From Swiss-Prot:
Catalytic reaction annotation: orotidine 5'-phosphate + H(+) = UMP + CO2
SUPFAM superfamilies reported for this sequence: Ribulose-phoshate binding barrel
Pfam families: OMPdecase (PF00215)
Native source organism of the sequence: Streptococcus pyogenes serotype M18 (strain MGAS8232)
Catalytic center residues: 63
Similarity comment: family membership: Belongs to the OMP decarboxylase family. Type 1 subfamily.
Protein name per its UniProtKB record: Orotidine 5'-phosphate decarboxylase
Quaternary structure note: Homodimer.
Sites where the protein binds substrate: 11, 34, 61-70, 117, 179, 188, 208-209
Gene Ontology molecular-function annotations: orotidine-5'-phosphate decarboxylase activity
Function of the molecule: Catalyzes the decarboxylation of orotidine 5'-monophosphate (OMP) to uridine 5'-monophosphate (UMP).
HAMAP family hit by this protein: OMPdecase_type1_B
Keywords: Decarboxylase, Lyase, Pyrimidine biosynthesis
Top-level taxonomic group: Bacteria
Length: 230
């Protein structure tokens, strides 16, 4: 099911920056935000509790990757924060993914990271010693996530159609690396516009700097939201 709101990546490290950004939006505007490693490691669980107290949805993107017992226990702790979505690394293997699902339970959305959108095929082959194509690697990880009963994967928008062809109906694709036309792509290698992501049926999109670093973040958010909605 498509999420109508773009997920905003809160690329901050301080509570003050985060609060100042969220305060720009009217109280009735309920956002879906991503808390990544920087903000979570700087502020801890309290930042999740604060954002949830405002009525926003929280995607906690910590990309857990460890032995199954450790991941299961960590997910059980994160579940207590009432998060709406969490991530694990698909490279941890099917047993680790199953353990993550057990720890988190069935309610929060659980998705696996396949290949980072900053990774090129040459980098994958050289650094990870994976000698298939980048797409084949992503599809392999996606099928493993589906086998482990995860809800979906994080992937490049260019990979969505192929993933949906090899996974069960309802398997979701969350696509970072979304940039409005003409914006700086930063360190992302595989990017698309919100309109392009909508056309190829991404279920969630994540947008960070084009919103958080815009001169008018609220206007930037509304423009991207409208383009995503079509």
């Amino acid at each position: 099911m498509k999420e109508e709101r773009p997920i905003i990546a809160l690329d901050f490290s301080s509570f003050e920056e985060t609060k100042a950004f969220l305060d720009l939006f009217p109280a009735e505007e309920k956002l879906y935000v991503k808390i990544g490693m920087e903000l979570y490691y700087a502020q801890g669980p309290d930042i999740v509790r604060y954002i949830k107290s405002l009525g926003h949805n929280v995607f906690l993107d910590l990309k857990l990757h460890d032995i199954p017992n450790t991941v299961r226990a960590a997910m059980a702790v994160l579940k207590e924060l009432d998060i709406d979505m969490a991530t694990v690394h698909a490279a941890g293997g099917v047993e680790m993914l199953k353990a993550a699902r057990e720890g988190l339970g069935q309610d929060p959305t659980l998705i696996a990271v396949t290949q980072l959108t900053s990774t090129s095929e040459d980098q994958m082959r050289g650094d990870q010693n994976i000698q298939t194509s980048l797409l084949e690697s992503v599809l392999h990880y996606s099928k493993g996530a589906a086998k482990a009963q995860l809800d979906g994967v994080v992937c490049s928008a260019q990979e969505v159609e192929a993933i949906k062809a090899v996974t069960p109906t309802g398997f979701t694709c969350l696509t970072p690396g979304i940039r409005p036309k003409g914006s700086n792509i930063g360190d992302q290698k595989r990017v698309m516009t919100p309109n392009q992501a909508r056309r190829i049926e991404s279920d969630y999109i994540v947008v960070g700097r084009p919103i958080t670093q815009a001169k008018d973040p609220v206007a930037a958010y509304q423009a991207i939201k409208a383009e995503w909605a079509g």
